[in-house]
């Protein structure tokens, strides 16, 4: 789905990966380390949302989040959401919220076609030793 509607399915509570073998906790990283990991992921989401590229859009999702993303529904969102297909590369980092085994990175996101600003939310955590996306949305 698009960053606008579909990823609200990511809800305010991240989808659990069930990964108990790796106890790396992202909240132990510094803000700078988290931001360095998050920004390329956010840029990729913006780019692939604009392109309507489902496979690329979900490539950094946690496995359970990727499974929750139905390709038909995502394609429909890409086709029908003007915001999801016109996100600007112009965004501002706002901050990080830590909780449990996840961090939420907040962005001020703009559109290349619509006036105004939106709040972007990217939820990150570890799965199988790699930083993955457990939720994302634009409000």
What are these regions (language model features)?
Residues 2-51:
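Short, low-complexity N-terminal intrinsically disordered segments enriched in polar/charged residues
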Residues 2-16, 51-58, 85-88, 112-117:
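Short, charge-rich amphipathic segments
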Residues 30, 42, 49, 60, ...:
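Functionally constrained cores in energy, signaling, and assembly domains
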Residues 34, 46-49, 53, 70, ...:
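Alpha-helical protein-protein interaction elements
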Residues 40, 55-96:
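Short solvent-exposed beta->alpha transition segments
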Residues 76-126, 135-139:
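Surface-exposed, charged secondary-structure patches
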